[in-house]
């Protein structure tokens, strides 16, 4: 326990919290344009071919974002919506693209029946 005199000489400092999604500048999402599409291999214990996109945000910042799901229709100069959320086994990938917005369509290479609704995309009802 510090003494009163010690606290007078060296006041307590608040902890600084780092922001992992600095390119979004405090916004929940930002619009971006695809510059390059790539396939990247993950870190050591995992083995796959993950799809990522290099984007230019509306603030003219360049970032790398993960493309979720099976199959995509993105090309160079496609408009996309970016949110925070990293891919744990891909170094340097701290952002994720949102499906169903702008040029990034919701359709996947095969239909999922078990996947829950996300971003207001309703599941097919059985009669």
UniProtKB/Swiss-Prot annotation:
It holds the Pfam family Ribosom_S12_S23. It comes from the Eukaryota. It comes from Acanthamoeba castellanii (Amoeba). The keyword Ribonucleoprotein applies. It is found in: Mitochondrion. GO terms for molecular function: structural constituent of ribosome. One of its GO terms (biological process) is translation. Belongs to the universal ribosomal protein uS12 family. GO terms for cellular component: mitochondrion; small ribosomal subunit. This is Small ribosomal subunit protein uS12m. CDD domains: Ribosomal_S12.
């Amino acid at each position: 326990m510090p003494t009163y005199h010690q606290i007078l000489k060296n006041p307590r400092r608040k902890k600084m919290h780092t922001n992992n999604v600095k390119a979004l500048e405090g916004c929940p999402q930002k619009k971006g344009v695809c510059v390059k599409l790539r396939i990247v291999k993950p870190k050591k214990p995992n083995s796959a071919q993950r799809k990522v996109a290099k984007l230019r945000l509306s603030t003219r910042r360049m970032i790398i974002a993960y493309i979720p799901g099976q199959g995509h229709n993105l090309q160079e100069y496609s408009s996309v919506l970016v949110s925070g959320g990293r891919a744990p086994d891909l170094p340097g990938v701290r952002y994720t693209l949102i499906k169903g917005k702008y040029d990034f369509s919701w359709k996947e290479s095969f239909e999922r029946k078990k996947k829950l609704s996300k971003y207001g995309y309703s599941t097919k009802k059985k009669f």
